[in-house]
Amino acid sequence: VSAMERANDVDLAQFRRWYSQSGTPELLISDAYDEQTHTYRLTVSQSTPPTADQMEKVNLHIPLKIALYDAKGTKQMLQHNGELLSDVLNVTEKDQVFEFHGIYGRPIPALLCDFSAPVKLDYDYTTEQLLGLLKFADNQFARWDAAQMLFTQELRRNVAHFQQGEAFEISPDVLTALAHVLENYEQDIELATLILTLPKDIEFAESFKTCLLYTSDAADEL
């Protein structure tokens, strides 16, 4: 870290906290689009849950790499007041707003590209957004992550069907997207294999944690 500071003439004191603070940081992200001003805003909130050795946590310097795509898959230029911006957002405060100008139409955000930081990400992606990222994102991690979230959505939906005694089904749109991956697998066989791999059991179970806690609390009240 010291060498990086000297080479780039920057203060990385906050970044050093990664080496002394335990636990996995979480990023809660929401967005808004203003059609009148063609402005897109990302609101990012960071937190790190208390751990046995550290109940009090401090804000970290979290590099959040992003990309924005329009509905046709064209990558948007990141700019603010005519000035080009880096695709890495420096999250250093508990709550921050990042504003992008010249965005014509609500974009699809690819968040945490290249897994730019070891954090948990909470953003309410729609199925349509995930299908778009899987189809045209130029970042391999973003495509793989979109596929994992799509699989999780489908698995959760079918668990609900099973609980209600209904038949299993897979969204035709998801099948079409996966078929597209297969049709173009020769471009990157290793990536295609990863994209078509279902989430691990523990990762899928983790996605149910909030739901199970809510159900347990409701049962206790009864």
Language-model features: where?
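Beta-strand-rich binding/interaction modules
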Residues: 12, 26-91, 96-103, 107-110
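Long, ordered, helix-rich scaffold segments
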Residues: 12, 101-216
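Flexible loop/turn segments at secondary-structure boundaries
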Residues: 23-26, 49-52, 140-142, 154-156
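Amphipathic alpha-helical substructures
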Residues: 1-40, 156-179
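A short, hydrophobic C-terminal helix/tail in secreted or cell-surface proteins
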Residues: 217-222
